[in-house]
Amino acid sequence: MRVGIKVLGCPKNEADCEVLAGVLREGGHEIVFDVKDADVVVLDTCAFIEDAKRESIDEIFSFVDAKDQYGYKLVVKGCLVQRYYEELKKEIPEVDQWIGVADPEEIANAIENGTDLVPDQPETVYRYRKRIDLEERPYAYVKISDGCDRGCTFCSIPSFKGSLRSRSIEDITREVEDLLKEGKKEIILVAQDTTSYGIDLYRKQALPDLLRRLNSLNGEFWIRVMYLHPDHLTEEIISAMLELDKVVKYFDVPVQHGSDKILKLMGRTKSSEELKKMLSSIRERFPDAVLRTSIIVGFPGETEEDFEELKQFVEEIQFDKLGAFVYSDEEGTVAFNLKEKVDPEMAKRRQEELLLLQAEISNSRLDRFVGKKLKFLVEGKEGKFLVGRTWTEAPEVDGVVFVRGKGKIGDFLEVVIKEHDEYDMWGSVI
């Protein structure tokens, strides 16, 4: 059969679906990239926060509406199904099949058999199989573990992704070796919490060991690590990231807040002062290191005083990149039962105010790259410009770099940065 796959949500879903595509192809099926050519459409969903759930529901109805026109069977899978299977099956009977969070081979078998598959509790993480690119790009997301044991009070992920399950270093290395042979120039390690990698398998935080192993592989490529939980970002992990030459000095550390009161309510263990000390130590050792974070505004109990402390924290740290999100009240979490809910309009105002502050900081932080030579990865072309990124930007969440010159997708070029705005930079090939 001909199978089309549409991915919603985080990079971890993208990695899952590319592996699933590989398993389906190994089983004799054809992967197609236009739904009108598909016998079966697989829609992968997200259920992390309200906006993600709403997007997933909207996409389900969009694909339901197009079923009669194109004649495909619709399979909806992923986190939304794992979390709300019974409700979805009852409310949207037009969907042909529902699949939750499961191993790619189990999912492929279920698709072939036409049976629903929703485990009581996810217990597997995929082992390496040959994967298929669902988009043409010079980078790949590699999932090193699944699930999470951290228990942040606002987070619903453990309820539908299960507890921590790490892949072996050997299995991850095999996958990365094959991706490099296929021409990938950037390997992006993802998980719910990359700092926890290996605790279940090796009884220790094994991210430094994994990074050293991957860094030893031949070839010119970047290694980027995302989702570094601040409470467990150790000196050993920081040192490995700073010392290994293929690991970019980009620290994605979602601190979530800067008020000690709110951090405690969130179930975080590091205080704002401890966070400042840790993040400042990275900059002291590597002044050009990029610090990225995520912030939740409007958490239950957040007062104007707490918000002012957050702004002061952000101004003091001077994050290079920052994503600010309005708190999403998720059933089943500890925070769901907290009193003193913040008015949504107030939370939205705080989000806008924080993003305006961050725009000024980001603009100022980019000043240091003007006139500098940076390695640039070509990802495409837009008008007269090559479009891509330097090591200072992660795909999809950060800005891009526009460069005058010649090159093709996957080329590393040396460029000099000429100018920038709050998020993007412009330069030319040397």
From Swiss-Prot:
Keyword Cytoplasm: yes
Keywords tagged on the record: 4Fe-4S, Cytoplasm, Iron, Iron-sulfur, Metal-binding, S-adenosyl-L-methionine, Transferase
Similarity remark: Belongs to the methylthiotransferase family. RimO subfamily.
Residue ranges annotated for the MTTase N-terminal domain, each copy included: 1-116
InterPro entries listed in its UniProt record: Elp3/MiaA/NifB-like_rSAM, Methylthiotransferase, Methylthiotransferase_CS, Methylthiotransferase_N, Methylthiotransferase_N_sf, NA-bd_OB-fold, Ribosomal_uS12_MeSTrfase_RimO, rSAM
Protein name in UniProt: Ribosomal protein uS12 methylthiotransferase RimO
Residues noted as binding [4Fe-4S] cluster 2 in the record, renumbered to the chain: 148, 152, 155
Recorded GO MF terms: 4 iron, 4 sulfur cluster binding; aspartic acid methylthiotransferase activity; metal ion binding; protein methylthiotransferase activity
Record GO biological process: tRNA modification
Cofactor binding: number and manner: Binds 2 [4Fe-4S] clusters. One cluster is coordinated with 3 cysteines and an exchangeable S-adenosyl-L-methionine. The two iron atoms in each cluster are connected via a penta-sulfide bridge.
Role, per record: Catalyzes the methylthiolation of an aspartic acid residue of ribosomal protein uS12.
Domain Radical SAM core: 134-365
Residues annotated to bind [4Fe-4S] cluster 1: 10, 46, 79
GN (gene name): rimO
Enzyme Commission code(s) on record: 2.8.4.4
Quaternary context: Monomer.
Domain TRAM: 367-430
Pfam families, per the entry: Radical_SAM, TRAM_2, UPF0004
Native source organism of the sequence: Thermotoga maritima (strain ATCC 43589 / DSM 3109 / JCM 10099 / NBRC 100826 / MSB8)
Cofactor(s) listed in the protein's UniProt record: [4Fe-4S] cluster
Matching PANTHER family: RIBOSOMAL PROTEIN S12 METHYLTHIOTRANSFERASE RIMO, RIBOSOMAL PROTEIN US12 METHYLTHIOTRANSFERASE RIMO
S-adenosyl-L-methionine is among the record's keywords: yes
Catalysed reactions listed for this entry: L-aspartate(89)-[ribosomal protein uS12]-hydrogen + (sulfur carrier)-SH + AH2 + 2 S-adenosyl-L-methionine = 3-methylsulfanyl-L-aspartate(89)-[ribosomal protein uS12]-hydrogen + (sulfur carrier)-H + 5'-deoxyadenosine + L-methionine + A + S-adenosyl-L-homocysteine + 2 H(+)
Locations listed in the record: Cytoplasm
GO cellular component, one term: cytosol
Lineage: Bacteria, Thermotogati, Thermotogota, Thermotogae, Thermotogales
